[in-house]
Amino acid sequence: MRKSAIIPALIVGALLARVEAGDSSPQLADSLERKVAHLRENGQKARPDPRPTVLTDEEVDAYMNSGRLKVPEGVSDIHLSTTVGEATAVAKVDFDRLLRDVRKNNMLWQLFTGVHDVKVRCGVWGKDGMGNVHVQNVWLDGHEIPRVALEFFLEHYIKPKVPQASLDSRFRMPVRIHTATVTKGKTTLTQR
């Protein structure tokens, strides 16, 4: 299974903790990489080991900022934190870099310029092999964007290019992950 297939599980396992930059970041990113490799290998077995795999917010945060995961150009300084059933992501978004090629095709994109703080809070859970992500709130520079505006933007400008895009996503979790339980500071994944 490709690394990119594990990303939905990481999101469901969600993640988002502010980690102080320090000497432990490479070790934390390595730890997450080993856990992802274990999940992949375990998922290929006829009878996967059902013991849980715990992903800490700190590991996910270190991995997301290590350069090992391809993120869109213009998105940086990603931080994740989890509480019971929720994940919150914060990132710096340079809209000039992110929308460089799209802007010329649509006037609406010209409204987005400069570097901004974007924060997204989601309800996340996984049960019976299905992952669920429900976007609850989105903030731009501390100002909450009304859901109706998010829905309009998604419907008219994102879905034509990415038909599966949604504020409420349900998907089969990869590598035979059966449950994803999100609690304070960690996500626990079990496989079947």
PLM features per residue range, with description:
Residues M1-I7:
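Bacterial N-terminal signal peptides that target proteins for export
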Residues I7-P8, K45:
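Intrinsically disordered, low-complexity segments enriched in polar/charged small residues
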Residues P8-L15:
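Bacterial N-terminal signal peptides
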Residues R18-R192:
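Extracellular/lumenal and peripheral-membrane lipid-interaction modules
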